[in-house]
Amino acid sequence: MHTTLLSNSMRGAALCTRVSSTTLNPVTLQTSAIYQTISLKNQTRPSSTSTVRFLKASPTLRTSSARPQAQIATSCINAKNTISVRSNSTTSTSAREEAAKLDWNSYFKLRASRRRYTLASSIVSSAVSTVVGVQVLSSQNLENLGAQVMGLDPFVVLGMATAACGAVGWLVGPFLGNAVWGLVNRSYKKAFLVKEKEFFDRIKRYRVDPSSNSMTNPVPDYYGEKIGSVQGYRQWLKDQRAYNRKRRSFIK
């Protein structure tokens, strides 16, 4: 009797344990699944918010990184402009200082010396080119060939060729003379060029209009080549005024 009661009670306990395990297992599974989904959401949310924040912050970063580049570019442009202005001002001041070292009388003296150098070099170069041309023509017997082609006397052809060689040397002479003069007077070259520019500006400003030129009223030294001193420049100005007076009186 007792054994049957004990066995029945044990069976009931076993059944209870089975029922409890079968009924509780789905609940535990559901709770574990919910916990996993919550944990996954918690894991994914920070990453999504961080990406959104990064995407939102990226334009500001781009703009902030672009602003220093624009500032650097503008500063470089301003620096270049200031450097160019300073260089122009320094060149103008240096040119004025160089021009101040040379007065007008010294400028006219240097101008006359340059003209003498160019004239002497033209004479020398024309003589050299003539001698060389005669030697080349006589050795190559080109005068006979020219006489056959043009039908002229060989002496005439030789004379024309010699004159052409001398003309070439005369034209080349001023370039050589200017080069030699620049080497001799290189200490005054910059100041001389500044004074020369100023002188020709004055000539262009005060010279007369050559459209009304005539035999009775010729243009007085249109390019100012005869001016050799300050007194000569003043006389040139007087001649220009006299020409204008004659022109106005003739028109009236």
Curated annotation (Swiss-Prot):
Q: Name one GO biological process term.
A: protein import into mitochondrial matrix
Query: Pfam families, per this entry?
Result: Pam17 (PF08566)
Q: Does the keyword tRNA processing apply?
A: no
Q: Which InterPro entries match?
A: Pam17 (IPR013875)
Task: Locate the transmembrane regions by residue number.
Answer: 117-137, 155-175
Its biological purpose = Component of the PAM complex, a complex required for the translocation of transit peptide-containing proteins from the inner membrane into the mitochondrial matrix in an ATP-dependent manner.
User: Of which family is this protein a member?
Assistant: Belongs to the PAM17 family.
The identity of this protein, by name, is Presequence translocated-associated motor subunit pam17, mitochondrial
| Species | Emericella nidulans (strain FGSC A4 / ATCC 38163 / CBS 112.46 / NRRL 194 / M139)
Q: What is the lineage of its organism?
A: Eukaryota, Fungi, Dikarya, Ascomycota, Pezizomycotina
Q: Which gene encodes it?
A: pam17
